[in-house]
Curated annotation (Swiss-Prot):
The active site is at residue 210. It catalyses: N(6)-methyl-AMP + H2O + H(+) = IMP + methylamine. This is N6-Methyl-AMP deaminase. GO terms for biological process: nucleotide metabolic process; response to alcohol. It holds the Pfam family A_deaminase. Keywords: Hydrolase, Metal-binding, Nucleotide metabolism, Zinc. Zn(2+) binds at residues 23, 25, 207, 292. Catalyzes the hydrolysis of the free cytosolic methylated adenosine nucleotide N(6)-methyl-AMP (N6-mAMP) to produce inositol monophosphate (IMP) and methylamine. Is required for the catabolism of cytosolic N6-mAMP, which is derived from the degradation of mRNA containing N6-methylated adenine (m6A). Its EC number is 3.5.4.-. The record marks 231 as: Important for catalytic activity. It comes from Mus musculus (Mouse). GO terms for molecular function: metal ion binding; N6-methyl-AMP deaminase activity. It comes from the Eukaryota.
Amino acid sequence: MEAGQQWPGKTDFYLQLPKVELHAHLNGSISSSTMKKLIAKKPHLNVHGHMTMIDKGKKRTLQECFQMFQVIHQLTTSAEDILMVTKDVIKEFADDGVKYLELRSTPREENATGMTRKTYVESVLEGIKQCKQENLDIDVRYLMAIDRRGGPTIARETVELAKEFFLSTENTVLGLDLSGDPTIGQANDFLEPLLEAKKAGLKLALHLAEIPNREKENQMLLSLLPDRIGHGTFLSASEAGALDQVDFVRQHQIPLELCLTSNIKSQTVPSYDQHHFGFWYSIAHPSVICTDDKGVFATYLSQEYQLAAETFNLTPFQVWDLSYESINYIFACDNTRSELRKRWTHLKQKVLNCNEVNYF
């Protein structure tokens, strides 16, 4: 079964389903329409669509995926670019029925345009603010990402930025993400800044166990007791030490952000039916369906829910509960959770009635 395959009559249910998106990288979420605008602004780069998106039925290695992000970064080099991208991405998630979104992105500096890490962050926040002023039906927050390639020095600078904006943005900046090429850098380099962030009250969403044979690193990052885990693909593998990590994650009920199409197209998981969502869902572990990079992987959250439901034979009520329970794992405050639950409850009958007409 390929991502993008349509099931006639069922699509409305997944689109109308209210959803929470907790693992979405800003630059990886740029749609083809926004990408065309960026490419038109920089024709000298000679970038084409296939260099920034993996089409239906195609796959790349994880390393090739990270190379694609380098191409995308060449297109988003100014504060104006970041503002436009942020607004477009938010609007597209809203159009897909996402009611709460935590966007993550690494603050970057670009000497050629004068963009600093701080103005990068300010551009993301301005995009969030403008979408709110336009009364879009979506609540958006921001997680600052530490890219492993930057090393410990830039990690510390990012933590300082996050602390500054955490205090000044009225709960818009909520936490930190550790991401980037998992083969670069040592986890030990990031423990101190991440711990400092945690002490300051910032939440931690850490990419963890994306690739095999990283038991020692996984243990180090788990020692921080992250608030959520991104991917966790090889936590459930039967390699030495991995079983202990599964038990640790289960005992501490650390929610997992699971991105099916991303893992298939980057070839860290061989097929949808072998995706580790099946294992974690079967033991009722806190799990959230996410897109990761909806632009690069040519997907959207409604489609990811549909893929999970079709692959693992979930009933419409199980799909609803999966979405509803994801509210528990957001980084915003209890009041926000309460408001979201009210919205879900208000929409429930309408969405499930739509399902009764179209699903079977």
